[in-house]
Amino acid sequence: MATNRRVERVASLIKREVSQMLMSGIKDDRVGAGMVSVTDVVVSGDLQHTKIFVSIYGTPEAKAETMEGLKSAASYVRSELGQRVRLRRTPEVIFVEDKGLERGTQVISLLEQLTREREAREAAQAAAGVVDSTEDA
């Protein structure tokens, strides 16, 4: 079992190499359907498996197409990693869509909507001459 420091270093190397492959190495047209970036890489403690989290910008159809392209390119990515990263055994590659950025954007949008609604409600109350009792406390 590798140390945490080694696992983190291997994850960092894999992230860098896969990012470079996404920019220039993968020739599958489906991968180019949406803008793809590697957001995180998780490597198992025994360095046998790696999950590569990718963020995809585009329509839902483009995202699905891009994920299919990435899944079909997993064996190519693994063989390239074997040549670029010096490991005794190259880990199995699994691509996972990272929806964290998308969810974060949705949360921010909802918060902005709530703020606008509250401001409109307060403006309507002020125009009617009603004072909010929570502000007096």
From Swiss-Prot:
<comment type="subunit">
    <text>Monomer. Binds 30S ribosomal subunits, but not 50S ribosomal subunits or 70S ribosomes.</text>
</comment>
<dbReference type="Pfam" id="PF02033">
    <property type="entry name" value="RBFA"/>
</dbReference>
<dbReference type="InterPro" id="IPR015946">
    <property type="entry name" value="KH_dom-like_a/b"/>
</dbReference>
<dbReference type="GO" id="GO:0043024">
    <property type="term" value="F:ribosomal small subunit binding"/>
</dbReference>
<dbReference type="InterPro" id="IPR000238">
    <property type="entry name" value="RbfA"/>
</dbReference>
<dbReference type="InterPro" id="IPR020053">
    <property type="entry name" value="Ribosome-bd_factorA_CS"/>
</dbReference>
<keyword id="KW-0690">Ribosome biogenesis</keyword>
<keyword id="KW-0963">Cytoplasm</keyword>
<comment type="function">
    <text>One of several proteins that assist in the late maturation steps of the functional core of the 30S ribosomal subunit. Associates with free 30S ribosomal subunits (but not with 30S subunits that are part of 70S ribosomes or polysomes). Required for efficient processing of 16S rRNA. May interact with the 5'-terminal helix region of 16S rRNA.</text>
</comment>
<dbReference type="GO" id="GO:0005829">
    <property type="term" value="C:cytosol"/>
</dbReference>
<protein>
    <recommendedName>
        <fullName>Ribosome-binding factor A</fullName>
    </recommendedName>
</protein>
<dbReference type="InterPro" id="IPR023799">
    <property type="entry name" value="RbfA_dom_sf"/>
</dbReference>
<comment type="similarity">
    <text>Belongs to the RbfA family.</text>
</comment>
<dbReference type="GO" id="GO:0030490">
    <property type="term" value="P:maturation of SSU-rRNA"/>
</dbReference>
